């Protein structure tokens, strides 16, 4: 069901490479996933930006990314455009991207029960150092949308979230969730703590669209 969609999704997903200095010959761990929503502009989870999850921390302004089809061909530098801890979102920019492939964001909720999937690069712990042999691991997981709810977030602001019914595959924050058509319905934002008992939580695509437009990102027109 998702074979064609996954092929197009992979063209626009990126691994965020951990910024820690690694010894020569060491494996390259992932710091999470980002995906392109307009040429040169990407969205990820705030927690995937080093220093982005803690309110007292200063986010790292520069990152190194590698697009899924380009693994083994070199990385691309990216800069942080803006970060909103309340929404759990961050925007990144690649000034001269090798590829302009971007994903289409849905502008309305999907029905409960919609078959979906997600793909990307689970985050690996960097404190104090990568696990021996840990490296970039690209994963795919199928699921169904199980709920859509609006709750009160930080500062009393309303927050919308989807949940899905399949267990989490590690901390896959930043992964795009997509339907069989290849359209993105949300971005996975894993809660801190024990992921084995956590329900997958998704920032809805509508919130990503609003976040992007509020920050001057010209999203491609829908056809």
Language-model-detected regions and their locations in the chain:
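Flexible, gly/ser-rich surface segments that form the specificity/activation loops bordering the active-site cleft
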Residues: 101-162, 167-172, 189-200
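Short, surface-exposed secondary-structure edge patches
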Residues: 5-6, 34, 105-109
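A short, Trp-centered hydrophobic/proline-enriched beta-strand micro-motif
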Residues: 6-23, 118
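C-terminal subregion of chymotrypsin/trypsin-like serine protease catalytic domains
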Residues: 6, 37, 178-223
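A conserved glycine-rich beta-strand in the N-terminal activation segment of trypsin-fold
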Residues: 2, 18-39, 45, 75-76, ...
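Terminal peptide-recognition signature
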Residues: 16, 34, 40, 44, ...
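Short, small/polar residue-rich loop motifs at catalytic or cofactor-binding pockets
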Residues: 28-31, 169-173
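Catalytic-histidine neighborhood of serine endopeptidases
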Residues: 31, 38-85
């Amino acid at each position: 069901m998702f074979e064609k969609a996954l092929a197009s999704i992979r063209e626009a997903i990126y691994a965020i490479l951990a910024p820690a200095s690694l010894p020569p010959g060491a494996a390259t761990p992932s710091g999470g996933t980002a995906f392109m929503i307009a040429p040169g502009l990407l969205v990820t989870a705030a927690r995937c930006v080093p220093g982005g999850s803690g309110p007292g921390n200063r986010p790292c302004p520069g990152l190194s990314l590698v697009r899924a089809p380009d693994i083994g061909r070199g990385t691309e530098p990216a800069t942080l455009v803006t970060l909103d801890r309340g929404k759990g979102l961050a925007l990144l920019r690649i000034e001269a991207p090798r590829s302009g492939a971007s994903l289409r964001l849905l502008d309305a909720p999907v029905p409960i029960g919609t078959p979906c999937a997600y793909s990307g690069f689970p985050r690996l712990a960097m404190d104090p150092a990568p696990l021996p042999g840990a490296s970039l691991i690209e994963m795919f997981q199928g699921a169904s949308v199980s709920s859509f709810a609006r709750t009160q977030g930080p500062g009393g602001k309303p927050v919308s979230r989807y949940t899905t019914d399949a267990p989490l595959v590690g901390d896959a924050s930043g992964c795009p969730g997509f339907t069989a058509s290849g359209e993105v319905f949300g971005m996975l934002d894993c809660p801190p703590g024990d992921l084995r008992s956590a329900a997958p939580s998704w920032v809805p695509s509508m919130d990503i669209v609003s976040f992007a437009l509020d920050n001057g990102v010209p999203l491609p027109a829908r056809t």
